[in-house]
Each structure stands twice: as C-alpha cells, then as structure tokens.
A protein has these predicted regions:
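Interfacial helix-cap and linker-helix signal at transmembrane-aqueous boundaries
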Residues: 50-51, 82-83, 171-174, 252-253, ...
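C-terminal ends and interior cores of transmembrane alpha-helices
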Residues: 97-111, 300-312
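Juxtamembrane intracellular "pre-TM" segments in multi-pass secondary transporters
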Residues: 2-23, 200-232
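Hydrophobic core of transmembrane alpha-helices in multi-pass small-molecule transporters
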Residues: 34, 114-129, 235, 316-330
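Helix-loop boundary and gating motifs at the non-cytosolic
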Residues: 15, 19-69, 226-267
Length: 450
C-alpha cells in the first residue's frame, strides 16, 4: 500500500504552500509589485489626462507618449548593467524612485508639450527598469521547478494590481488629477523602502543548473540565438496589449461616449480572469510543447481582438477582454521562463532587459502609429491593425526554432545493456535534433522535479 511519501500518493501542493516555499525576498517582491501596480493610477489614464487636462489632440498625445516612451527603451537597456553592477535590489529601488520623480514633475508643472515628454521619459525610465530587474531576481532565487509558478504569481500580482489601480485612479481623477498623481508617487516610494529593507543586494545563487556556454554578447545566431529570436518575436503579442492601453480609453470615451470609469472596469475584468485562471493555466501548460503554447496564445489574442473589432460595443469590449487575457497569460509565463531556462546565469539580466526592451519598443511605436491611423482614418482601422498583429506572430512562431526545456528531458533508463557505438551515435544525433523541436512547455520543470 502506498504511503504518504510514495510517488503515486503525494497530493498536489496548493498554491499557498508553493508560495510559502519561495524565498522570502521573492515573496516580498511579489507583494510590493502588487501594491505598486495597485497604486499605478497615472499610466492607464495618461492619454485621457493629456487630451482633457492639457488640451492636446489625440495625435499629439500619441506622439508625446511615443516620445516619452523612449524612456522605457532606455530603462530596459539600463536594467541589465545596473543589475550586474549594483545588484537587483538597487535596480528595483532606483526604478521606483525615478518613476516617482518623473510623475511628480508631470503632475505639477505646466509648460510646453516637450516638457511633458521629458518628464514622462524620466518616469518611464524607471518603469522600464523595474520589470527586467524583477524577472532577473526571480531567475536568481527560484529553482527551475519554481520558475513557472513564480512568473505566474508575478504576472497575477501585477495584473491584479492593474485591475485595482486604474479603477482607483479613475475615481481619483474624477476628483482631481493632482490626487491621482500624488497617490501614484506615494505608493511607489513606500514600495522602494520595503524592497530596500527586505531584498538582499546580492541575489545570485551560484548554484544554477549548467546551461549552454557561449559568449557574453547577445547575438542573432550562436548559442543563445533561439532565445533572442523568441524574445524579438514576442513583439507581435506585446503590441496588441500596448495598442489596447492607448486606443481603448479613447475609443470608450469618444466613440462609445462612455465614462472613463469603464476603462477601469476593463482592467478589473482582465485581473479577474488572470486571478481566476492564471494558476490553472500554469498547471496545464506543462503538458504542451512550447511552440503549441505560443500558437495558442496568438490564436486567443486574435480571437479576442476579432470580437472587439467586428462587434464594437460595450459588451464586445468586456467579452473580448476575457478572451485575449488568456493569450496574454500564456505568453507572459512562457517567454521569461524560456529565458531563465536557456540563458547562462550571468547573462539572464541582459536577456530579461531585452525582453523589457521589446515592451518599450512597442510602447514607442504603437501609440504613435495608431494615433496617426486614428487621426487620418478613424477608430475602426486602428482595431483592424491590432487584429492583424497577433496573426503575424502566429506565422512567425510556427517556423521559429524552439528548444525544449533541459529540465524536461527524459531520464536515462534504469537498466539495460549499453548500446553499440553506432546506435549510441544515432541516439545522440536524434537527441540533439529533438532539442530544437517544439518541446515540452516551460512548466515541465515542475513535473520533472516531483
């Protein structure tokens, strides 16, 4: 009879048990990230603020956001070197302080439009630094078996906070834009203090599983080339999200003549789906190849945007949010886990920074491009453009070279004669070939560690 310690009798751990097993600095990171996101009042309503409070046109606001969003690119690029030179903790604290300083100026100063772009640049340098530094900290402290769960928890916390933040921000903005900015700044600085106290400066484990050796540079080919191409291709799944952040508030308030509070409802629906289904999806993605997961993510993105495009209404806005959020969950877990599983520990920070750079690039080009389309052709072509983007991503991931997780490789047989040399060479060749196929999903590390 199997005992409680037998292989087949062990019950799956609850998410609370798995969360408690994570290192304390990671738990602190997840809590502060949630609180910081819940206090992120400004960014989701930035376009509305610039149009209604500062009197800018939609195209001008889009251009200003695009110019200011170069700060995301700079912040993403700075994150890797700062993490390497000063540590993950200092990078996180600096990110929050810069964000607070930029928003302080943006919320209190009146001037020419270029001053708004400059202040937004400073704020978004901080925002661009935070995400890659947080992902690098997770890669440092979480074991390979814990990584998919850790990135899922991080994603859920961020999105739950984003569901609360815009809702509170909308209420604050209805009272006063100054209150909206003040709340954002105070919460960010409090989170910086908590991270400074509870997260150690040096978080490199020094015990990471060996990965493929290679040069320190990020190259289009070579050992880490497949990781680089995956990160770059993820742009096609990031761009629709940025497009929704820019276009949806304007579409809701101008085309549907609804309250800006509905934008907060959309973020809340997004968060409800993430919280309700995120951990369930994390358990199931272990059963599927990475390529399949990425294709399904693109299909869900396309389906959700099709609902919004062809049935443009308040009901369609809410229904589409449920669908595309599922695709967002899958991609947001698969990509950083793939980086952590396949990149040398000393290069993880740079690849996480590159992942953040892709997000920053989307924030740079998407609002400006969609703003021009909206200004010249109206809202519906903007929705058409966003629908096409994940379809392109599906085509790219269908042909991209993708490796399986090293942790999911099958174990060697327990007994049996050694193969002949020719058979051994053939098996070795087959194994090397299989590693480039669409192998098991990144969460297979959880199953293989059981």
């Amino acid at each position: 009879m199997a005992t409680s310690t037998g292989e087949g009798a062990a019950a799956p751990k609850s998410w609370t048990v798995r969360f408690k097993e994570l290192p304390l600095p990671l738990r602190v990171l997840f809590v502060t990230s949630f609180v910081n996101r819940a206090g992120m009042f400004v960014f989701p309503l930035l376009a509305v603020y610039l149009v209604r409070s500062k009197g800018l046109g939609t195209a001008e606001a889009g251009l200003l956001i695009s110019v200011g969003s170069t700060g995301l690119l700079v912040g993403s690029l700075l994150s890797g070197p700062v993490c390497d030179l000063r540590g993950r903790r200092d990078a996180l604290v600096a990110a929050l302080v810069l964000n607070a300083v930029g928003y302080l100026g943006l919320g209190t100063l009146d001037g020419a439009p270029w001053t708004y772009a400059l202040l937004l640049f400073v704020a978004l340098v901080g925002m661009g630094m935070f995400g890659p530094a947080a992902n690098t900290l997770i890669a440092d402290l979480a074991t390979p078996e814990q990584r998919p769960f850790s990135y899922t928890v991080s994603y859920i916390g961020n999105n739950l906070g984003m569901g609360i933040g815009p809702l509170l921000g909308g209420v604050a903005a209805a009272y006063s834009y100054h209150v909206m900015f003040a709340g954002n700044i105070v919460v960010g600085l409090l989170c910086a203090v908590v991270i400074r106290i509870w997260v150690p400066r040096d978080t490199k484990s020094g015990t990471a599983a060996p990965k493929a050796a290679g040069g320190g540079r990020i190259r289009l080919g070579g050992v880490h080339g497949h990781v680089l191409w995956m990160v770059l291709a993820s742009f096609f799944y990031v761009a629709p999200l940025i497009g929704l952040e820019y276009a949806l508030p304007l579409a809701v308030t101008t085309e549907l003549n609804a309250s800006a509070g509905l934008v907060g409802v959309v973020y809340t629906v997004n968060s409800v789906v993430v919280v309700g289904l995120g951990l369930q999806l994390e358990k199931r993605i272990a059963s599927y190849p990475i390529r399949t997961l990425l294709l399904v993510a693109g299909a869900l993105w396309a389906l959700g945007l099709a609902v919004l495009d062809f049935g443009f209404s308040l009901a369609a806005v809410l229904a589409s949010t449920v669908v595309w959020t599922l695709g967002e969950i899958i991609a947001s877990v698969v990509v950083p886990t793939y980086i952590a599983d396949h990149v040398d520990e000393h290069r993880v920070g740079r690849f996480m920074a590159l992942n953040g750079f892709v997000l920053g690039l989307a924030r740079l080009v998407v609002p400006f491009g969609l703003g021009l389309i909206w200004q010249n052709h109206g809202a519906r072509p903007v929705l058409h453009t966003m629908l096409v983007t994940p379809l392109v991503g599906i085509a790219v991931f269908a042909v991209l070279r993708i490796r399986s997780s090293a942790a999911s490789a099958p174990a060697a047989p327990a007994a049996g004669p050694a193969p002949a040399s020719a058979a051994s060479a053939a098996a070795s060749s087959a194994s090397a070939s299989a590693s480039v196929e669409a192998g098991p999903g990144p969460a297979d590390a959880v199953r293989s560690g059981a």
